[in-house]
Regions:
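Class I SAM-dependent methyltransferase SAM/SAH-binding core
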Residues: 95-137
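A C-terminal cap/extension of S-adenosyl-L-methionine-dependent methyltransferases
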Residues: 127, 234-238, 244-292
């Protein structure tokens, strides 16, 4: 046997050893779902498996330029009115780039609120009165003509969705509008782990223990597992008395490789869906404009 053939044989042997290690280290201790788990992992490894997010659309968390560009995109494409001379609140503002972008768009006042001080130090230093973790400050500075809640609803902690919406309603002006982008956990990128693994539905296709094994590390994804998101959103809005001005469901059809895979059956079984959740999996976002 020549060297080239020997290398090929060794590669085949290494692959078989790796497969055997998976079975020994994971599948055998978890025999209940061993077959479906293994098939799911093999499907996700395929280069043909769709990405969760187009890489060109992922904001580089280490790039200030990317963060500013994202903030501009949210204001320009999502808020359907001029901010000039209006009071603006970004609920769940994170580092706060959208808060500053609102000022760039001539808002008379812009405030960023978050439950934790994760504000950008440089932005906060230059705009000390524009960031707070104290809700009483939000109330004091209100009411607001435009309130943004962008990709926050599905991450709420410590308070119910109804309580949060009621709080927001109290600081919204009589003719004001609440812009809400919902990002369901059931969407292809709803786990927010595309920086670690940019595979569509990986956060749902694998259980937490399976995902930890698949990635070789534990991922702390703080997203509320809402299996029927559209109902949850509508029920919350109804319970708080907001009027729905517009509701826009942003769908993406499931690719054949996903539809035809055993992963759909695994998801259905793992999360006790009565039927295959193809509708839920096809909803990427739900956008609302709400008023009093």
């Amino acid at each position: 046997m020549n060297d080239e053939n020997l290398i090929k044989e060794m590669k085949i042997l290494q692959d078989k050893i790796e497969e055997l290690n998976i079975k020994i280290n994971f599948l055998i201790p978890n025999q209940k779902n061993s077959a479906s788990s293994y098939l799911a992992m093999e499907s996700l490894k395929s280069p043909l498996w769709p990405e969760a997010v187009d890489p060109s659309m992922i904001c580089d968390i280490n790039s200030e330029e990317d963060k500013v560009e994202r903030a501009n995109s949210v204001i320009d494409l999502y808020i359907e009115e001029n901010l000039r001379n209006k009071k603006f609140l970004d609920f769940g503002c994170g580092e706060g780039h959208i808060v500053i972008t609102a000022y760039d768009n001539k808002a008379s006042y812009s405030l960023g609120y978050d439950i934790k001080d994760v504000f950008s130090p440089s932005l906060k230093e230059k705009n000390k009165d524009s960031f707070t973790t104290d809700w009483s400050v939000v109330e004091e500075k209100g009411p607001y003509d435009i309130i943004l809640m962008y990709d926050v609803f599905d991450h709420l902690e410590n308070e119910s969705e109804v309580d949060v919406f009621n709080k927001i309603k109290k600081v919204l002006s009589a003719q004001g509008k609440l812009y809400v982008r919902m990002h369901p956990w059931t969407s292809r990128h709803g786990g927010h782990i595309y920086n670690e693994c940019n595979k569509a539905f990986v956060h749902i296709a694998l259980t937490e223990s399976e995902l930890e094994y698949f990635l070789g590390k534990k991922i702390n994804s703080k997203v509320n597992k809402n299996f029927y998101p559209l109902k949850k959103y509508r029920d919350t809005i109804l319970a708080t008395g907001f009027n729905i001005i517009t509701e826009n469901i942003v769908n993406q059809e499931l690719e054949p490789i996903i539809k035809d895979s055993k992963i759909i059956e695994k998801i259905t079984k793992d999360y006790n869906f009565m039927d295959k959740p193809t509708f839920q999996l096809g909803v990427n976002f739900v956008d609302y404009i709400l008023g009093k």
